[in-house]
């Protein structure tokens, strides 16, 4: 489905998203993508099938330039062919990135680094984008900009899975939400409906 799916996590968010992306082996269950069981496939094969991950804390190569970090996202053959086009699209989504292409990524602010991390994932031409805590450690104004871009990415046809502890933000932009606690799904459903459940409002929204 071409949806934004929000996952509000109280524990084990990294294990969840890493298992989906093939970075951790599953101890049970399966991951199905496009009707195919892809459990425990290596990340490079999942990337070629249309998945891309924006990891928590960005994980940029800080000694490399912004351009070099972005181009690392376009490693599989289909993405390499469209590398210049994809780079231009990233710069359209994040105008500040265009001005920093020749700068070492380690000199950027946290918000700018997050832009580069999202841009790097988009360079892989994903059909589904997995984001792990994209708002972590960012100023409120930057968070607002980041979520607007995530909405734009979705509107252009990319499905999004968002692991996020900022519950109000996640509910606002997602169509479906899963609430995890200690590795178990304790609530799921339409995001608008979940946002109006008294127990969710009390436990996660402070209302």
Residue ranges and their predicted role:
Residues 11-207:
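Glycine-rich phosphate-binding loops of nucleotide-dependent enzymes
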Residues 1-10:
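Single conserved hydrophobic/aromatic residue that forms the stacking wall/gate
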């Amino acid at each position: 489905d071409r949806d934004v799916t929000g996952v509000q996590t109280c524990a084990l968010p990294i294990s969840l998203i890493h298992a989906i992306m093939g970075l951790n082996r599953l101890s049970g269950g399966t991951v199905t993508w496009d009707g195919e069981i892809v459990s425990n496939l290596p990340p490079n094969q999942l990337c070629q099938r249309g998945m891309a991950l924006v990891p928590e804390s960005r994980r940029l190569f800080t000694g490399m330039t912004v351009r070099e970090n972005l181009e690392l996202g376009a490693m599989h053959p289909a993405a390499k062919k469209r590398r210049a086009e994809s780079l231009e699209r990233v710069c359209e989504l994040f105008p500040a990135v265009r001005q920093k292409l020749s700068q070492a990524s380690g000199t950027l602010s946290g918000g700018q680094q997050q832009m580069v991390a999202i841009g790097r994932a988009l360079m892989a031409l994903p059909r589904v984008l997995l984001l792990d805590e994209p708002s972590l450690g960012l100023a409120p104004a930057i968070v607002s900009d980041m979520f607007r871009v995530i909405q734009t990415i979705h509107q252009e046809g990319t499905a999004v899975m968002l692991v996020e502890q900022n519950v109000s933000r996640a509910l606002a932009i997602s169509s479906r939400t899963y609430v995890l606690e200690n590795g178990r799904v304790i609530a799921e459903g339409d995001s608008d409906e979940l946002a109006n459940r008294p127990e969710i409002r009390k436990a996660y929204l402070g209302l």
